[in-house]
């Protein structure tokens, strides 16, 4: 006898000939010969059954008629060394039987088979199965597959078998793979129609109501399975009082603008949520120290340096919807770098910076409206400055800190409205080169330089400004001090990434936990090596339906955009 496989083959031969068999598994009219010792060694169920006086020691039969005969037979063959022959048709029966008999290796083999073959065609079936038998591993994997393929599944014949509890779980999930929230009510209505079940308020609460278009809200109002329920209409009548909703992960794209290590080109990167990686989607020739503003999903890059030693007045843009560069944009009124960039609903603003002629600081703010042939003067800051933080909040332009005359930082905070400039509570410390973001009605700044005299100290400070109370609050510091990092807000969280730390480009990112007031290094948003991220913008997907007039079959029209 050379090895265990030969021994198993011999024992299986004994079983087939009935030699030394001391137990019969009875399933209805079928019988399976076996050995108690062999079954006990492979199955926890049989081990307990045969050793704890559950049956008489002289008993020769065990009745398992509540189990599927073919599955039990396949598993006993498996115990005796015959490989399982798994298919999509039999794997569920074999797995549930293996789970009952507690045959660990067979359970693992069945689970691995399902996970390997999981797809949009079988994920609902396996999800319902896993939920019934409380298999968390398969339930989680099949649920994620449903989320990823949800718009394919709304016409699947198994879609109607999902329970209301499952639909609430699906429609509530941040990872639901829809690029526009208007598709969530479509998913709900398709399920209601397939089950002929009336809507409930619990289902409506899963929708991000504040993100829905008026056309889709009207479609909900008018649908018979919604309008017939008084509680649902009452809920929809009060949506104006609901809190603002945050977009789902797939309804926005994180687009970063920076300089790559590939000959220092401008690089546009997109975050892949599925792979948890940044992927370069476009690049162009080198430029640095430029300002960035985003309007209508177009990223504008203003001024800065190109490959010459002189500052530039050129403005270029990248259209995230068409994945194309735009070059025919009017130039700035004069070359400048280290300026601030902002946008409101109509205009792009270029703020302050360093002029090319004599490297002097400028206080001018210019604005440009897309389709207009030139930039126009808008205002002047109280003092010339560069490398300041800028933010647009409640229709006001805020200018924060920056470098002023003498290469020193300032702690000034001012806002510009139609009535002119207004001073606000000063920063707790003089700062420049920090990142700035508006989040949840406040202005947040992080990193940069801070010093009262010469600009030379890299900061890890994070501050928030409340415009209602006109006060600054110091938050937990970054783990890594950095200048000119990118600060962005997505899915109700704050992130900071990139920048320069200790004169070296850093590819690290950090996430802020508001409840714990702490920053955590974020392995999921690590940047490409030697990549300076100037700005990161959540870009909301746009669809032509947003300008479409409402009709009675609007949801059917919406469905035609699936896959586009």
Swiss-Prot record:
PANTHER family linked: KELCH-LIKE PROTEIN 32, LD33804P
Domain notes for this protein: The BTB domain is responsible for the interaction with CUL3 while the Kelch repeat domains supposely serve to recruit the cellular substrates.
Identification of the protein by name: Kelch repeat and BTB domain-containing protein 1
Function summary: Probable substrate-specific adapter of CUL3-containing E3 ubiquitin-protein ligases which mediate the ubiquitination and subsequent proteasomal degradation of host target proteins.
GO CC, alphabetical: host cell cytoplasm
SUPFAM superfamilies, per the entry: Kelch motif (SSF117281), POZ domain (SSF54695)
The protein's assembly and partners: Interacts (via BTB domain) with host CUL3.
Domain BTB: 21-88
Taxonomic superkingdom: Viruses
BP GO terms, sorted: symbiont-mediated perturbation of host ubiquitin-like protein modification
Subcellular location(s) of the protein: Host cytoplasm
Alphabetic keyword roster: Early protein, Host cytoplasm, Host-virus interaction, Kelch repeat, Modulation of host E3 ubiquitin ligases by virus, Modulation of host ubiquitin pathway by virus, Repeat, Ubl conjugation pathway
Family: Belongs to the poxviruses Kelch family.
Database matches in PROSITE patterns: BTB
Principal location listed in the UniProt entry: host cell
Kelch repeats: 252-297, 298-346, 347-395, 397-441, 442-492, 494-539
